Amino acid sequence: MREAGRGGSPVLVLHGGPGPAGVAPLVEHLASDHRVVAPTHPGWDGTVRPGDLDSVPALAAAHLGLLGRLGLRDVTVIGTSFGGWVATQTALDDREGRISRLVLVDAIGPVIPGQRITVPTGPPAPASQGGPSAQAMAALRAYAGPTMADADLLPRLSTVTCPVLVLWGVDDTVVTPDFGRAYAAAFPHARFELVPGAGHQPIREKPETVFTRLDSFLTPRTSATGH
């Protein structure tokens, strides 16, 4: 787990397939105004995934446990790609009201009619191109299952009443902007924004645009409704 920053409201950053390196620029940016907690999902970067940690709900429970151990409340959770699915599940399962805002960046998770998740079938892309390692892909499959989606997720999103920002690369071919629009529309209080010139990894491809959108969403903070 990485922690950065000392003041301001807490932010939990959940990485996607490429691992912690994929969100490192975001962590650095947020650390100037926030306390940032960026855990490594077990199974990435040489970490061991326990056998009973084999689903997205189990991983979300682990991250909620981390927030509890750290005593954090009024938490903004940010997740990208697979991390967005975990972030969504974390918000759904937050029985103690620790989470006040949710940010999804080109997130996967729900089954959306007429849309699909296009997972590359060739060898993993090199890390220099933001690709996940073979170990990361194995962990991803263990958590996400063969379909990389949860058929029961979409109708449950109406219960997440905190403010939600959904950012999407306009050129994403893994999960298209139409997927993102439908994802956002399932939340009661979400806004959807496209990131021009970006594909599935806007944090790597257009970091300044992402940071500007995030800063606008997070500052000034307004009261959240909770759930």
Label every PLM stretch briefly.
Residues 2-48:
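Conserved HGGG/HGGXW glycine-rich cap/lid loop of the alpha/beta-hydrolase fold
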Residues 26, 176-185:
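Short alpha-helix in the alpha/beta-hydrolase fold that links the catalytic acid
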Residues 85-93, 98-128:
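Flexible "cap/lid" loop of the alpha/beta hydrolase fold
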Residues 171-175:
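Acidic catalytic loop of the alpha/beta-hydrolase fold
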Residues 190-191, 197-227:
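Catalytic active-site module of serine/aspartate enzymes centered on a nucleophile-bearing elbow/loop
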